[in-house]
Amino acid sequence: LRPLPGAQSVETVCTGLDGLVERAADYYAQGARFAKWRAVLQITADGCPSDLAIRENAWGLARYARSVQESGLVPIIEPEILMDGDHSIEVTSAVQEQILKEVYFACQLNGVLLEGTLLKPSMTIQGADCAQKSDPQIVAEMTVRTLERCVPASVPGIVFLSGGLSEEAASVYLNNMNTILRKAQWNLGFSYGRALQHSCLKAWAGKDKEAGQAALLARAKANSEASQGRYVPGSQPSSDEQLFVAGYTY
C-alpha cells in the first residue's frame, strides 16, 4: 500500500500491477490457484473515502483480477473498509455500496469473468468508536442487504475478512447471515486472520503445540458451522477480546 497522490493523507492505493501477468503465470506453474489483492479504504469525518480513492482502488482491483485470470488464477477481490472511526452502521453501508458498485463496474470494463472470482469484503458494521453498537442480527441483515444491492449473482462466493472483530463476534455475525433468506445464492464463508488465529497463538505461545492446535481446530469448527448457519454461540472455545487496533497496517 502506498499513499495516493491527490487524495487525503490517510488514503492509499495498492501497487504492483506491472509484470503481474508474468508473475501470476509463474505462481500458477508452481502450484498456486488463487491470488489476493487488498485495497484499503477508511471512513472519516472530513470526507474519506474520496471519489478518487474509491475509483483508483476499484480500478486496481479490477486490473489485478483480469491480470491473474489471464494466467489461470482465481482472484480474491478484497475492498476492505477499516473499522477506525465513530461512524454509524448506516454510514458504513452507504459507503460500502458506493465502493462495491465501483468495483464491479471496473470489473465489467476490464472483462473480468465474475464466475471465476471471490469477493472478500468487510462486514457492514459501525466504526469502532461509535457509541451505538449494533446487535449481531442487525449487522447480519445490513451486511446481506448491502451485498444484495451491489454484488452480482454470478459471483459464486463471498469470504469475509474479520477486520478486528473478536473471534466470537466474527463467528456469530457470519452464522446469522447464513440464516437469512437471500436473493442471490452466493456461498458466504470466511477468510479470517486474527479472528481465526488469536486463541491459537495465545495457547501455543511458542511452546505448547497441542494447545495451539486444539484452539485452532475449535475456531475452524466454529466458523465452518457458521458458514452453514449451524453455529451455536459459545459452543466452541473462543475469545471475546476485541482484536481491533486503531491505525493497524500490514
Regions found by a protein language model. Name each.
Residues 9-11, 47-49, 179-185:
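Intrinsically disordered, low-complexity coil segments
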Residues 8-25, 49-64, 97-98:
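Glycine-rich anion/phosphate-binding loops
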Residues 34-39, 72-81, 112-122:
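Short beta-strand segments at enzyme active-site cores
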Residues 29, 67-70, 109, 149:
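Residues at alpha-helix termini
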Residues 6-8, 39-53, 81-87, 128:
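Glycine-rich, proline-tolerant flexible connector loops at the mouths of alpha/beta enzymes
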Residues 1-10, 18-47:
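Long, hydrophobic/aromatic-enriched structural stretches that serve as scaffold segments
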